[in-house]
Amino acid sequence: MKKSEFTENPAPVELEGTVLRICFDTEEVDQVINNGEEGQEPATRKVYLAYVIRVNNPFTLENVTKALLKEGFDEFKAVAVAAESLLTANEAGLLPGNALELARQMQIARISEYDASDAVNQFSFDDVPMWLDKDTRNGLIARLNAEKAVGKTTSTLWLGTQSFTITPDAGLQLLSALEVYASECYDKTAEHKTAIVALNDVDAIKSYDFTQGYPAHLEF
């Protein structure tokens, strides 16, 4: 989805008759309006770029989320933006709604989005950042154990077109450490979600720092 351009900072939510316009991920940029042609000095102007969706009534979390999914955003992003937009509209008096529940839905989706990002799902091997999901880890464990059983002393692992040579024992040790790391991250994510559900104040939920407490990235 391409961002739309505005000459002024757009409101995050706005009613256009019976349609709710939602602007998000807004950024301010300097746009070149000439290239110093004909002896002129280069000039720029401030513009705002934002993703824009428009949703017809009823303005429910489900409907707004569906509109975002249709535009290609993933589920966590869609729910987070939908809940935040409806919460903003509620706080501005534009729409009714359960502010507390919307705040919880927003933060829980953000936590899930963060948990799935490189901020959590990343380690480095020989200074190369990478990640192995659980299915891949399990497959590698089976492979390395099999290679160890038949007496192989080295194994070649691939990340795209890049290869890494490692001994089966070192590979199994790496995967064990990675499994512990992934488990600790899972526990921390669950802890944050539980904390959000327990909060009964919208401002406290909105200001909750769900990035805290995760283990440091592993380096091998």
Regions found by a protein language model. Give the residues of each.
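Protein-protein interaction/assembly regions in multi-subunit complexes
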Residues: 49-53
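A preference for well-ordered globular domain cores
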Residues: 1-19, 26-45, 55-220
